[in-house]
């Protein structure tokens, strides 16, 4: 048997090697930029989505079911009336918002019979401080009492509306071709479902195999739709969406189970499944995403901004061609959990802090 001091030394060496592994293979560059951080308006508990109305006026959702109009120049904040009822349980509630002209799109967890909920898309006209003529454009056909994995990020691109649905914590539904669960949905601007992009998929399904989409954006040059989603323990990923593609969850994943075991057979690639263009290990719990194409921060121009819930930080991903090549943390633990990211017309960066005492923040050149 080995002497006790040798056992201790072996254990110490293993610990040192483990630390060195994480330093060299999981390092993130921290390069915070000099910014002026301003809190805009009164606190909003757990804000989730932001979209510009016009000028300095923006809409901000709160997960509890409230919608606010906020003037980022004055901080004035006004509630919007006639918001649809929501299933405000755990991750559910009033989630993303996108506005174009006077038309407002809301993605939310819609209350259904027997205590269940479904991810849904709602459309209305904003007139003054109220929504008018509201209608539900889409309701998922997968109902659950679960308060997890609603997805719900929206982007408008060309003639279509795209939005991502999570699998509600029931992973196998992401591969069920009869369900909208774990899918990106595509609707025409009139609210009609676009043709299915894959064989035997329901109308409107553009892609499948998603776990929990939390960020979506249109690339300003290529027009491609980029989407990021949460993995389990590790394996958060960015995908460039292709019509008819299956992104693999839960058959393929770069993450592991929360208890440490393999997800399924532990596959990170398999025939018939699309690969991500970026993977985070360990997870950062990404949320919100925006391409930066303004001049206020020239060092960020042409890159991608991603918020992190887990590390309460803002990430900047530099692109090589049209794919991510490297990342750096440019704002670290200043405002809490970053839920959404948007770039204002003047180049300032708008962030939502998902905290009980959260709200809207503006980052500008110091």
Model-identified regions with their sequence ranges:
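Short, Lys/Arg-enriched N-terminal segments with co-localized hydrophobic residues
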Residues: 1-8
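Bacterial N-terminal signal peptides that target proteins for export
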Residues: 8-17
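Bacterial N-terminal signal peptides
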Residues: 17-26
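Acidic, Gly/Ser/Thr-rich repeat motifs that build Ca2+-stabilized beta-propeller blades
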Residues: 30-170, 218, 223-231, 282-320, ...
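Short, glycine/acidic-rich beta->alpha junctions
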Residues: 42, 146, 205-209, 333
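Beta-propeller domain segments
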Residues: 92-94, 167-328, 336, 346-347, ...
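Short, solvent-exposed aromatic-acidic interface loops
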Residues: 110, 138-142, 200, 255-257, ...
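Repeated scaffold domains used in trafficking and secretory/extracellular systems
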Residues: 338-340
């Amino acid at each position: 048997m080995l002497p006790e001091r040798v056992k201790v030394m072996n254990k110490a060496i293993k610990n040192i090697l483990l630390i060195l592994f994480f330093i060299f293979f999981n390092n993130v560059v921290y390069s915070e930029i000099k910014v002026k951080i301003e809190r805009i308006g009164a606190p909003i508990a757990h804000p989730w989505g932001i979209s510009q109305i016009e000028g300095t006026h923006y809409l901000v959702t709160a997960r509890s079911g409230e919608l606010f109009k906020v003037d980022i120049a004055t901080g004035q904040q006004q509630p919007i009336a006639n918001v649809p009822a929501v299933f405000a349980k755990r991750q559910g509630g009033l989630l993303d918002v996108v506005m174009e002209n006077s038309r407002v799109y809301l993605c939310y967890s819609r209350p259904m019979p027997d205590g269940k909920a479904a991810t849904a898309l709602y459309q209305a006209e904003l007139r003054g401080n109220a929504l008018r003529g509201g209608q539900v454009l889409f309701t998922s056909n997968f109902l659950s009492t679960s308060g997890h994995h609603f997805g719900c990020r929206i982007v408008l691109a060309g003639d279509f509306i795209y939005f991502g649905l999570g699998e509600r914590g029931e992973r196998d539904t992401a591969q069920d071709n009869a369900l909208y669960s774990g899918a990106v949905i595509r609707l025409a601007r009139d609210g009609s479902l676009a043709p299915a992009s894959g064989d035997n998929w329901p109308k409107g399904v553009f892609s499948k195999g998603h776990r929990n989409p939390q960020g979506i954006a249109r690339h300003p040059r290529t027009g491609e739709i980029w989407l990021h989603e949460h993995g389990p323990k590790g394996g958060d990923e960015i995908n460039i969406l292709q019509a008819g593609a299956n992104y693999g969850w839960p058959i393929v994943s770069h993450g592991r189970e929360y208890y440490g075991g393999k997800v399924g057979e532990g596959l990170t690639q398999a025939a018939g499944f699309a690969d991500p263009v970026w993977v985070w290990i360990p997870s950062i719990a990404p949320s919100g995403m925006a391409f930066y194409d303004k001049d206020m921060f020239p060092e960020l121009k042409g890159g991608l901004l991603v918020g992190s819930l887990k590390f309460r930080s803002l990430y900047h991903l530099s692109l090589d061609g049209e794919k991510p090549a490297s990342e750096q943390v440019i704002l670290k633990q200043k405002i809490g959990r970053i839920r959404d990211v948007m770039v204002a017309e003047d180049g300032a960066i708008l962030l939502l802090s998902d905290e009980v005492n959260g709200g809207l923040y503006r980052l500008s050149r110091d």
